[in-house]
UniProtKB/Swiss-Prot annotation:
PANTHER family associated with the record: RNASE ADAPTER PROTEIN RAPZ
Organism, scientific name: Lysinibacillus sphaericus (strain C3-41)
Protein name, entry field: Nucleotide-binding protein Bsph_0448
Family, per entry: Belongs to the RapZ-like family.
Positions with a binding annotation for GTP: 70-73
Binding site for ATP: 19-26
GO MF term set: ATP binding; GTP binding
Described function: Displays ATPase and GTPase activities.
InterPro entries: P-loop_NTPase, RapZ-like, RapZ-like_N, RapZ_C
Length: 297
């Protein structure tokens, strides 16, 4: 059920994630979060209209929201259809339901593997809770826009399916972030790959280069002319050409590559600029020099 009204402005998108407990809702909400959706876990349907009213009052022109609604909401879950009808009347939000399902045997196996209790299994037997939940969700499943059976899916496959269905063109852009930094200011905690280039000859000890940075030709030419730098560039070029397509294939949205030297002024900046320019012809690339303005610290 897609809730739309022709002729009215629709500025917000809502994806309601629901379905059987153990069918993959946690993986789903994480996938939507990676796509840039504002995500809410375990939102009671009775509060959905209140939340959307606050969203409208915020004045934001466009927002994408993904909300998990499941049987943890108790009796509130009965309010879901009423909340969707309310959205239909307002007409400024496109709402879709993603229902995640799996066969009974798979759900029982998953509960046993995690050693968690089914939320509706009063007797303690997962199958009893599964049967009760399936009956309670039958109407919602019938009104869903998308029904994914995850019985034979791995988490990665579910994520790929969600990305294929719900990602915009902007969401699928893979970005390589190239960073320079100084070890004396601490290692970057968000880097995927860190390369220590302190083994290269340091321009800091060349008096006329000391006050300059790797952004200036005198320093970059000095660093790039070193034999060790040329060998490093050759090896890292081969490594990046091999690895980066595989990172993209794995579904990563970004890769952070950091080059570190002592202070983050000369060698790391030069290498970050070089590989930023090299990768820019292949990938969406962003260059950041974290410590370049911390010379006196």
């Amino acid at each position: 059920m897609t809730v739309v009204v022709e002729g009215q402005q629709r500025t917000h998108e809502l994806v309601i994630i629901t379905g059987m407990s153990g069918a993959g809702k946690t993986v789903a909400i994480q996938s939507f979060e990676d796509l840039g959706y504002y995500c809410i876990d375990n939102l009671p349907p009775a509060l959905l209209t209140t939340f959307l009213t606050l969203l409208r009052d915020s004045g934001k022109n466009s927002t994408r929201i993904a909300a998990v609604m499941d049987m943890r909401g108790g009796n509130f879950f009965d309010a879901l259809i009423g909340a969707l009808d309310h959205i239909l009347k307002e007409g400024d939000i496109v709402a879709r339901i993603l229902f995640l399902d799996a066969d009974d045997a798979t759900l029982v196996r998953r509960y046993k593997e995690t050693r968690r209790a089914h939320p509706l299994a009063v007797s303690g037997l997962p199958l009893d809770g599964i049967k009760q939940e399936r009956a309670l969700l039958s109407e919602v499943k019938g009104r869903a826009n998308f029904v994914y059976n995850t019985s034979n899916m791995k988490p990665k496959q579910l994520r790929e399916k969600i990305v294929k269905e719900f990602a915009s063109e902007a969401d699928t852009i893979f970005t390589v972030n190239i960073m320079s930094f100084g070890f004396k200011h601490g290692m970057p905690i968000d880097a995927d790959l860190v390369f220590d280039v302190r083994f290269l000859k340091n321009p800091y000890y060349v008096e006329e280069l000391r006050p300059k940075t790797g952004l200036q030709t005198e320093v970059s030419s000095y660093v790039l002319a070193l034999e060790d730098t040329q060998i490093l560039i050759q090896k890292l070029t081969d490594l990046f050409d091999f690895m980066i397509p595989l990172y993209r294939q794995e579904g990563k949205s970004q890769l952070v590559i950091a080059f570190g030297c002592t202070g983050g002024q000369h060698r790391s900046v030069t290498l970050a600029e070089f590989f930023g320019a090299y990768l820019a012809s292949k990938e969406n690339t962003v260059i950041t020099h974290r410590d370049i303005n911390r010379r006196k610290e």
